[in-house]
């Protein structure tokens, strides 16, 4: 039986102070249903970084995974752009 496609998100690392965990902020543009104005909606998720290779400010790709801890349900796949 084939596995279903997992969600992939791109965001920016805003915290790397925890062991093997990074906090990634995802910013999306959504249109207001009545006023038809675009709004920036951001959310922060904790992602598992096994090799601890991402740093503060990096642009990363994360993918949905099984629950790793109470709040971690995402896994770091790759670093798209390093911070300067």
UniProtKB/Swiss-Prot annotation:
Keyword Ribosomal protein: yes
GO biological process, one term: translation
Keywords of this entry: Ribonucleoprotein, Ribosomal protein, RNA-binding, rRNA-binding
InterPro entries: NA-bd_OB-fold (IPR012340), Ribosomal_uS17 (IPR000266), Ribosomal_uS17_bact/chlr (IPR019984), Ribosomal_uS17_CS (IPR019979)
SUPFAM superfamilies (alphabetical): Nucleic acid-binding proteins (SSF50249)
Cited PROSITE patterns: RIBOSOMAL_S17
GO terms of molecular function: rRNA binding; structural constituent of ribosome
Ribosomal protein as UniProt keyword: yes
Pfam family, one: Ribosomal_S17
Family per record: Belongs to the universal ribosomal protein uS17 family.
Described function: One of the primary rRNA binding proteins, it binds specifically to the 5'-end of 16S ribosomal RNA.
Subunit structure: Part of the 30S ribosomal subunit.
The protein's name in its UniProt record: Small ribosomal subunit protein uS17
Species, as recorded: Borrelia recurrentis (strain A1)
